[in-house]
UniProtKB/Swiss-Prot annotation:
Record-linked Gene3D superfamilies: Ribosomal protein L10e/L16 (3.90.1170.10)
Keywords in alphabetical order: Ribonucleoprotein, Ribosomal protein, RNA-binding, rRNA-binding, tRNA-binding
Name of the featured protein: Large ribosomal subunit protein uL16
Gene of this entry: rplP
Matches recorded under PANTHER family: 50S/60S RIBOSOMAL PROTEIN L16, LARGE RIBOSOMAL SUBUNIT PROTEIN UL16M
GO cellular component: cytosolic large ribosomal subunit
Function: Binds 23S rRNA and is also seen to make contacts with the A and possibly P site tRNAs.
GO molecular function, one term: tRNA binding
Length: 143
């Protein structure tokens, strides 16, 4: 499960998920990518489930890059606890994903195999996703 080694603050504000992704919106390492079409919090368990789904399908064929990391702690108070008495303790970690963010990259496999691996990974995530090729995003960026 992904989580930071050390953090400055154990509890953070919820923040805003408005707008598009300005960073991490290009395929940089691999040939193919999985792009988010909606804004959401992606938990470390969901990232791990998507990674396992991809690597099991491509077997030893290609290489997978995870381009999102869960930096944000989500707190929760125990069940049947009265309101007040401070903020709850950190329960799990999430990555804030905005539309346009490339979440996973893949290289070393054919396009058909990459498309199917990304489809399996997208089913593990709580948002709509799109399969992209490196050339497609470079053409859009050059306009």
């Amino acid at each position: 499960m992904l989580m930071p080694k050390r953090v400055k603050r154990r509890r953070v504000h919820r923040g805003s998920m408005a707008g598009q992704a300005h960073k991490g919106n290009k395929v940089t390492y691999g040939e193919f990518g999985l792009v988010a079409l909606e804004a959401s919090w992606i938990t470390s368990n969901q990232i791990e489930a998507a990674r396992i789904a991809m690597t099991r399908y491509i077997k030893r064929g290609g290489k997978v890059w995870i381009k999102i990391f869960p930096h944000k702690p989500v707190t929760r108070k125990p069940a049947e606890t009265r309101m007040g008495a401070g903020k709850g303790s950190p329960e799990y970690w999430v990555a804030v994903v905005k539309p346009g963010r490339v979440m996973f990259e893949l290289a070393g496999v054919s396009e058909d195999k990459a498309r199917e691996a990304m489809r399996l990974a997208a089913h593990k995530l709580p948002i709509k996703c799109k399969f992209v090729k490196k050339e497609d995003l470079e053409v859009k960026g050059g306009e």
